[in-house]
Amino acid sequence: MEMSFRWYGEDDPVTLENIGQIPTMKGIVTAIYDVPVGEVWSRERIQQLKEKVEAAGLKISVIESVPVHEDIKLGRPTRDLLIDNYIQTVKNLAAEGIDTICYNFMPVFDWTRTDLAYQYPDGSTALIFDETVSKKMDPVNGELSLPGWDASYSKEEMKAIMDAYAEIDEEKLWENLTYFIKRIIPEAEAVGVKMAIHPDDPPYSIFGLPRIITGLEAIERFVKLYDSKSNGITLCVGSYASDPQNDVLEISRRAFELERVNFVHARNIKLGDGKSFKESAHPSEYGSIDMYEVIKLCHEFGFEGAIRPDHGRMIWGETGRPGYGLYDRALGATYLSGLYEAVIKGSK
């Protein structure tokens, strides 16, 4: 299991030097953020990114992510050229020794929260999703702004794309994902790249948009789209646990049994009323996920890939990108590494 940390590039207030000082830290999870979605990432740009990370004594563990263009998700005629570009990016990453790519197939929005700075009684702030608030939000009127999004839309563009998705139900989205997978995975497999689809976050429909990577049944359907370990998943326990109907430990065990876990996101959440939840500190006592059991499964199945603490609270007066501060994620990383050491030594 390789401990890793998300880095948003030169604009990230958390520096590579900061990350390198975290005990047990080995890898960086990052991307090239200024290439428009759908265009090829050149080898030169990948080399520059790789050199910068390695100069800090770290390595690129995972690319998160190479975004999937909306035209691919919508199944538009332009998708073939866009998929060709995606394949070339995969090949360029492989040529530079990068072998794991996290991506998602969520329509329009990446991870979605209703408050980016909910304040806990101790003064720390965290990301939360309030189901009641979400039902009152209108994305067309620009009431959403998230640091994790790869694109921003004008009001007119947002209306147009939301209208386009009105014609796409879950089965049609599955059909479009299948088309993408059958084009991408053979090429990824040929160059030794493991693709890792991230679950929808949260894993249920929002704003009337279809969501399909949502739980155990979805994972079992997904891996059958193309039988290859290159066609794998990102086991984001916080995302899957956000639906109270999901048993995240059952999902985790089954995903490992299928040998399709190519990347792990380990964060905790505290379930609330209905489908509401708050992101919490990583230790089990603060959330609804038994993190010890998650790490135990990683060891039981011999997981050797990258794991990252994913989101964290903002603590100790830190400001910056919500969910992606240094301090709480660093605490999370060392906590997860401590669990891993305890599991290993306890199994002897």
Swiss-Prot record:
Domain of life per record: Bacteria
Keyword Transit peptide applies: no
Alphabetically ordered keywords of this record: Iron, Lyase, Manganese
Enzyme Commission code(s) on record: 4.2.1.8
Pathway annotation from the record: Carbohydrate metabolism; pentose and glucuronate interconversion
SUPFAM superfamilies found in the cross-reference section: Xylose isomerase-like
Family recorded in the similarity comment: Belongs to the mannonate dehydratase family.
Protein's recorded name: Mannonate dehydratase
Organism: Streptococcus agalactiae serotype Ia (strain ATCC 27591 / A909 / CDC SS700)
Gene: uxuA
